[in-house]
Amino acid sequence: MVLARIPFQTQARAGAVTMLNAYAASENIKLQVYRARPRSINPPTAFVDAINETMTEFTITMRQRIPTVEVIIVWGLFDSGEAADQRDAFVDGFADWVADNFHGFGTNTLVASVSLQDLPSYIPDWMPDSEKKTYYATQVSLEGFAAT
């Protein structure tokens, strides 16, 4: 028996981007979405910052994969009341969107929003020093599951 193969990290990244775009479109939010860190940020902007994964081998033919996609959503240059309201409405609605679209990482997989964390002094460390700004952002962790 051969282990079923799923390009799960590929599907997880694509699924996160698709869910962000679909939710933003459903709520008429002008959100720039990137599948990796962008060259520049013009809020509101969302992007996949990192993917981490744990894998458990149960037998030669069975394993479990749990990738966690870390998404950063940048709201603005400072924590204003308007940016905070935008953040609250988005993360509440997006968490429900993910729950309703639990196969968002692909067939025979599950996804859930497992963590939300405000980043009130977020500085994109990959940008040149001359372009670095301090932003108000939120990190959303989307955890997938597949048993193959």
Language-model region placement:
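Charged, amphipathic alpha-helical segments and their flanking helix caps
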Residues: 1-38, 51-148
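Low-complexity, acidic Ser/Thr/Pro/Gly-rich terminal tails and inter-domain linkers that flank the onset
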Residues: 42-52
